[in-house]
Amino acid sequence: MQYDIIVIGGGHAGIEACLAAARMGAKTLLITILAEQIGAASCNPAIGGLAKGHLVKEIDALGGQMGVCTDFAGIQFRTLNESKGPAVRGSRAQIDMDRYRIFMRNVLLNTSNLNISQEIATEILTENDQITGVKTHLGNVYETNRLIITTGTFLNGLIHVGENKLSAGRVGEFPSIRLSQSLKNLGLKMGRLKTGTCPRVDAKTIDFSALELQNGDAQAHPFSFKTRFFANEIEKFTKNLSKNFDENGNFNPTQIPCYITYTNEKTHEIIRNNFDRAPLFTGQIHGIGPRYCPSIEDKINKFADRDRHHVFVEPQTAEASEYYLNGLSTSLPYDVQVEFLHSVKGFENAKIVRHGYAIEYDFVEPTELKHSLETKKINGLYLAGQINGTTGYEEAAAQGLIAGINAALDIQNKAPLILRRDEAYIGVLIDDLVTKGTKEPYRMFTSRAEFRLLLREDNAIFRLSGYGHDIGLIKDYEFDEISRRKAQIQKGINFLLNNVITPNKENLAKLKSLGADAISQNTTWQKIVGGKNFSAEKIREIDSMFVDFSDDELSEILTECKYYFYIQMQKDEVAKMKNMLNTKIPTELDFSKISGLSNEIIEKLNKFNPPTLFAASEISGVTPAAIDILHIYIKQFKGK
């Protein structure tokens, strides 16, 4: 049996990879251990968040599936950091985990060019460092020249609950052990990481009256441009799967509340008294865990001065019969989990439905990858998701999409899609991984991006949909609508930049009615709109041309006006960076004479002999600081 592309693993990375490949015309096979669990949310019942919301909207802009599914499975929608600037705001949705999984599985089953097989991949087949196929536990051999591995925590997964250990990829699911050995046999550098999850509790046993209420936003904002622009069309396709649309096809989800409680000194004492039974401290766990999502025992150990920690109580489904306790990830023994949980306000009589646990798993050092997510050593082998050292559904989905796109582009003999750091958070994510590597689970933050004002959630669709359209994942009619809206926004911005208001009596009265500050000299409308007291809806009162602008378009215009000069500064920085990267490296340059470069970087530059600074920047381990040093030296060298 032969396929153009084979994907191993049906999690968030695998879904995006196989959908992108199949939709781009490649005959695709998804091999997954348990078909019913395609799209399962292994940990928290939420999509998005700070920087993660950016990733979801970028995935959507490129033609991925995560945003659409989130809109139809969402049961609470919130914008985080709303009081801060638009660059760091993040969209987050609680999801019905069952609805999300069922929706994703149905999408895959109804996608042309895509087959699904429930098997365990055991061996990667190669010939002369070229992928030739994959073998499964059933003895089946599937031939392909392009293989995408998206195994998540299943790669040699080992679960810990106290001193108890269990080989598994998730509770109740087989791990992928032989595949890990097959990767090692290919000579790939590998390591061991760890993550964890919290107890899930029966809603009937929670005292909600003792908890703080956390509602969603009054107005829910969808993740996908398809939900915003083409809701009627999508609602017809998914009418039996989602209740998030009203009778007119408008996005109007019923939002279910979350709750907040806190640990206390008694909780901490119980956990401290059982440190000697915690696999995290006894040496039982060897993998490195996520710095920014530590277990409760790790938090109490590292932050001994804290007298309490937040616990976010989140429904797992629309029925809200079971709750996820965000903040209580643990690998402590079951009896200790019960004891410390009963010390938390509102959970004195709580019954655990599913215990918390830690899981260790193998990963491949991401410096083994090209920016296309193809491995350097094996042609046609792509890796995406937690196997590359990341943590999070959104980070995984972003990598899966890029791997699927690039495998399909390779079939078409086209150059891979490589997003720059100034173009997308996806570009930042992949560049960080392949150039710097990681020794701990990597998660995305807005602080990782140098050009945050250019990479906002609200402009993701305008930044990246051109790529999605070019490769065939964004349909013509979708791109036409996106282009129309982009042109409409630019038209509005140009009007505000080019039209001046004079400080006469009539205009001053108009400014007062708009709540804007008075002016004493001729001023562009852009500066007026960019004032701190101006709101998006007031733009409609400036000129009749704005009457038909949508709320989203006005909001985008407001942001561009408020941060206009800072945005221009970042655009200038990007232009300078592009010019710098185009700088040619003289062939006679002796890298060993450049002070400030490490021996490792000098060795790599000598090995690959890059013709330009851009080519040098693509070499794994060559840092931005090294590129700056090279640039300065080249200018001095040419001036001699």
UniProtKB/Swiss-Prot annotation:
Which PROSITE patterns does the annotation name? GIDA_1, GIDA_2
Q: What is its main location?
A: cytoplasm
Which cofactor(s) does the record list? FAD
Q: Name one Pfam family in it.
A: GIDA_C_1st
Q: Name one GO molecular function term.
A: flavin adenine dinucleotide binding
Q: Which residues are NAD(+)-binding?
A: 289-303
Which processes are annotated in GO (biological process)?
tRNA methylation; tRNA wobble uridine modification
Tree of life domain = Bacteria
Q: Which UniProt key words apply to this protein?
A: Cytoplasm, FAD, Flavoprotein, NAD, tRNA processing
Homology family: Belongs to the MnmG family.
Listed HAMAP family: MnmG_GidA
Instruction: Spell out the NCBIfam families in the cross-references.
Output: mnmG_gidA (TIGR00136)
What role is this protein assigned?
NAD-binding protein involved in the addition of a carboxymethylaminomethyl (cmnm) group at the wobble position (U34) of certain tRNAs, forming tRNA-cmnm(5)s(2)U34.
Q: How does it assemble?
A: Homodimer. Heterotetramer of two MnmE and two MnmG subunits.
**Under which name does UniProt file this protein?**
tRNA uridine 5-carboxymethylaminomethyl modification enzyme MnmG
Q: Which organism is it from?
A: Campylobacter hominis (strain ATCC BAA-381 / DSM 21671 / CCUG 45161 / LMG 19568 / NCTC 13146 / CH001A)
